[in-house]
Design a protein with these regions (language model features):
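Active-site segments that bind and position negatively charged phosphate/pyrophosphate groups
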Residues: 185-299
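Structural motif
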Residues: 8, 30-31, 84-87, 108-110, ...
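Short glycine/serine/threonine-rich phosphate/pyrophosphate-binding segments
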Residues: 16, 39-43, 93-99, 118-122, ...
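C-terminal charged capping/lid subdomain of soluble metabolic enzymes
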Residues: 2, 170, 286-326
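ATP/NTP phosphate-donor binding region
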Residues: 1-85, 310
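A glycine/threonine-rich phosphate-anchoring loop and its flanking beta-alpha core
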Residues: 7, 103-195
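A short, small-residue-rich loop immediately preceding and capping a beta-strand
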Residues: 78-101, 105-116
Length: 326
């Protein structure tokens, strides 16, 4: 079985308000799951709006990460309070935790991304970490979220750094899937690869404009945030596990074992992993296309203030066998 997309998607400037009639049909006792203090105001709005719909609303926050300690604690909250859905409102870790908890307890999940930093609001996948942010594994879930609310006004309040991170993460879709899946004889997978190529081209064209015009909510910005949060998720939905991870994300997972990950966003680390992946490709058979891709990506990544080297992530490869770990 393959879950390709959320059952219902609301997108645009008033997506949250438009979603409310559908949410109240789905749930009577939702749990709003969040984490960071920077998104408190938005979560409070979500809480008030649901209360005004006469729902019995509870709230809970992750203390650490999308980790088993937090998941177990929130599972207990859900069971003790007869919660019938989870509304995950936040970044990738919150969205992944909400999806995982809903999957474990067989209740609907509603994802409300509050930044464009990942496509986690779309996918039937959760990445599990230790409470210190070290990657453990990814878990394929039974289905994508029941409802995805991609409200541009919510996302517009996020720091521009989160958009830069989302661009780096989404760019990796093409470079990874073209390696892992290019020879697979599966029509859907091949179509996913082609979508990821168009996604890459759009981000190379609009990415820097969007980063500089976040508070204008113009066409470049709208196209880019939807590319990061929606189209990137569609690639994973259509391509499935065959379009998931090559060196860029594998390097990210290794780097989380070394550094204090709360200093860096997921896509910031993936971006460095992507450059290293392309460097490895360039070294193999003297691949000139990989070298050209590095030059092209370096221009954009510097415009987006993204780290481009392991050293910029605070790693000395000559200490503690760090190079071997990566």
């Amino acid at each position: 079985m393959q879950s390709i997309s959320p059952e219902t998607i609301f997108r645009g400037n008033d997506a949250w308000q438009k979603s409310l009639p559908h949410i109240i049909k789905l749930t009577k006792s939702p749990l709003i799951l969040g984490r960071g203090i920077h998104t408190n105001n938005l979560r409070n709005k979500i809480f008030r709006d649901l209360k005004n719909q006469n729902l019995n609303v509870k709230c809970a926050n992750l203390r650490f990460d999308c980790c088993y300690e937090d998941i177990s604690r929130i599972n207990n909250i859900v069971l003790k309070n007869n919660i019938d859905s989870v509304i995950a409102a936040g970044g990738g870790k919150v969205l992944d935790a909400g999806k995982y908890i809903s999957d474990c307890l067989d209740i609907p999940c509603i994802t409300v991304p509050l930044s464009a930093s990942t496509c986690a609001g779309w996918t039937a996948l959760s990445n599990i970490y230790t409470k210190y942010g070290q990657f453990i594994k990814d878990v394929a879930l039974g289905s994508c979220p029941k409802i995805l609310v991609y409200d541009h006004k919510f996302i517009q309040t996020a720091p521009s750094r989160t958009l830069a991170s989302g661009i780096a993460d989404a760019l990796a879709k093409w470079y990874e899937s073209s390696i892992t899946s290019s020879k697979i004889d599966d029509g859907l997978v091949q179509q996913a690869i082609q979508i990821s190529r168009v996604l890459r081209d759009q981000l190379l064209i609009d990415g820097e404009k969007a980063f500089r015009s976040q508070f204008e909510n113009n066409l470049s910005w709208r196209n880019t945030v939807e590319a990061c949060g929606l189209t990137a998720g569609l690639v994973g939905g259509i391509g499935g596990e065959k379009c998931r991870t090559a060196a860029a994300h594998a390097i990210h997972n290794a780097i989380t074992q070394i550094i204090t990950t709360n200093k860096f966003l997921h896509g910031e680390i993936v971006g460095v992993g992507l450059l290293l992946q392309l460097r490895l490709e360039g070294m193999k058979n003297n691949n000139k296309l990989a070298d050209q891709s590095i030059k092209q990506l370096l221009v954009l990544m510097k415009q987006l203030n993204l780290p481009t080297t392991i050293a910029q992530l605070g790693i000395n490869v000559f200490e503690n066998n760090n190079l071997e770990k990566i």
